Amino acid sequence: MRLLGYISFIFLLGSCGVIRNTPKFGLQDGVYQTNQENVFIETQNDTLLVFSENGVKQLNSLPLSTTSPQSNFAFQKSTFDLDVLAIPVKYRVSQSVIPAQLTSEINAALYVGKRKDYFQVIFEKNPTNRFKRKIDHYGFSVGGFVGLSNSVINSDVSQGSVPYEYQGITFSKGIAGIIAINNFTIGVAYGFDNLLDKNSSQWIYNQKPWIGLVLGLNLN
């Protein structure tokens, strides 16, 4: 289980290129909200074209580079969020004679939530007196998750009922909040674990709350 967890963690890190190219991490073609109205954005030859929502009237053209000063623009989008979460670190409160501790097993979970993304298009002047387009992005997501994880089961965490040590499989569930800033995504989870074997009633962390660090891989 521990080996499987680390393989999953490496997969998540190696998928950063996929994350950067998904619609939620870039200003892609589609309908967005502004302060005044909904608009449709389309990319043509590196230029962002802003149309009315029905695509009939062009409102603005935002080139990648220009010699003329440009106004800044802000767009936002609300979406359904489906992610695979890795929870590499959990903080467990003290139980019985065991003090509060951090555990580092890798946990995989399926996350479903509601997401809001914000994009700011600004033009920065460079030394050649050209204005280069820059897109800053940040987003928020809140939802619930379920998944499987593993935990060390031994005499210390079973009130002396289990005289041997093994890696127990647990079912995890809870809520999570995720923050995205440009290509960086991180979050916090609040959850509970259930040991999926006959020793669940003796495990001191069974159904006890924990707080974890979250890394996510966007699926949709």
Over which residues does each language-model region extend?
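Transmembrane beta-strands of outer-membrane beta-barrel pores
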Residues: 86-92, 114-118, 146-152, 181-183, ...
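Outer-membrane beta-barrel translocator domains and adjoining extracellular loop/strand segments
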Residues: 94-99, 124-125, 154-161, 199-203
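Outer membrane beta-barrel transmembrane domains
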Residues: 139-171
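Transmembrane beta-strands of outer-membrane beta-barrel proteins
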Residues: 80-84, 108, 138-144, 184-188, ...
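N-terminal leader/presequence regions that precede the main folded/catalytic core
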Residues: 2-92
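Predominantly the C-terminal beta-signal and adjacent terminal strand-loop region
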Residues: 24, 175, 182-220
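Residues that define the transmembrane beta-barrel architecture of outer-membrane proteins
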Residues: 78, 102-108, 138, 167-173, ...
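Short loop/turn motifs that connect adjacent beta-strands in outer-membrane beta-barrel proteins
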Residues: 70-79, 118-140
